[in-house]
Amino acid sequence: MKKLLPALLLCLPLVTVAEPVRQINNQRDMCQAMLQGVAFNLYLEKTCGFNGGVSRKLAQIGARQCADIFTDREARALSEEAIHKGTMRFEGFGKSQFCSANRQGYNDAGRLADDFLKRKP
C-alpha cells in the first residue's frame, strides 16, 4: 500500500467541479480512480485547451501501477463514465466556469505526476 499512496494523492485534485471523492480501499479502487483521472484530464485538455500533458503523465503512472487490473472492456467503460460525467458538468456549468474551476486541480495533478514519474519504478 505504501507504493499506492503517492498515486492516490494524484487522484485527489483531478476533479474540482465534481462529486465527493470516492473512498479508495485497495489497488483496484486506486487504479479505477487513476484510469478515470486519465480520461477526465484528457477531456479537460480537449475541451478547455489545457496543454500540460497531465492525461499522458497519469497514463504512464497507471501503466506502472495498474497493469492487468482491468480488461480492455472494463477500462473503456470506466473511461466513458468519466468523460460522460465531465460532459454533464461542462453542460451544467458552461465552458468558462467549468474550465476555470478545473484549472488549479489540473495543474496540481501535473506537478504531482511529474514528481511521481521522477521516482524509480
Map each language-model feature to its residues.
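Sec-dependent signal peptide recognition
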Residues: K2-A7
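N-terminal signal peptide c-region/cleavage motif recognized by signal peptidases
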Residues: P13-A18
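Helix-centric, low-specificity signal for extended rod-like, repetitive segments
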Residues: V21, V38-A39, M88, S96
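Short N-proximal segments of mature Sec-exported proteins
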Residues: R22-R73
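Compact alpha-helical subdomains of small soluble proteins
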Residues: K57-P121
